[in-house]
Amino acid sequence: MSIHVVVMGVAGCGKSTVAEAIHERLGYVYAEGDDFHPQANIDKMSAGIPLTDEDRWPWLNVINSWMVAREALGENTVVSSSALKRSYREVLAKDVPTFFIHLNGSHELIQQRLSERKGHFMPPALLPSQFAILEPLVPEENGVEISIEGSVDEMVDRAIKALNAYATTVAATVAAQTATQAA
């Protein structure tokens, strides 16, 4: 069984940076969630218009399909995606075992990072709309909240430590299921 990781959070929290680091350190196949957006979504965000649920469903389903395809190949994946609402995360995780890493920080820190970011279609003016709809992970979801305070390496180390603990749990569960089926 493969492991699929979604690095989530509002714009500017470091999703792509952490996802790329997981790819580099652990060899997981990486995809940038923004690359799955249809042009209409990019145009809307570029114009400073927040996406609606109806805008997001097709995008989330495409990311899910990508993870399913990698699962069929036995590949572990890591993808960056805002995954702001639980209903969005349910779409992402509906067909594959998924672990969410929620990067969390203060509005002020993230606003500062967004204002320093160059070449991205997501304008800083949309950040309040993302915080407004953000639903934290709940215990029923596989995942962990990671603070974005400190260095990138510290953030990545915390994320990988949590991911390794999850992977150990998954491996133990699979081993127990295999033993039960063999008995």
Can you say where each PLM-predicted feature lies in the sequence?
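Hydrophobic anchor at the beta1->P-loop junction of P-loop NTPases
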Residues: 7
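Conserved phosphate-donor/acceptor-positioning beta-strand/loop module used by diverse small-molecule
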Residues: 95-113, 146
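Small-molecule kinase domains that catalyze NTP-dependent phosphoryl transfer to phosphate-bearing small molecules
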Residues: 117-158, 166
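Walker A (P-loop) ATP-phosphate-binding motif of ABC ATPase nucleotide-binding domains
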Residues: 4
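P-loop (Walker A) phosphate-binding loop of NTP-binding proteins
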Residues: 10
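Loop/turn-to-beta-strand initiation segments
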Residues: 73-77, 99
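Conserved substrate/cofactor phosphate-moiety recognition/catalytic segment
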Residues: 13, 20-65
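C-terminal accessory "lid"/substrate-recognition subdomains
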Residues: 164-183
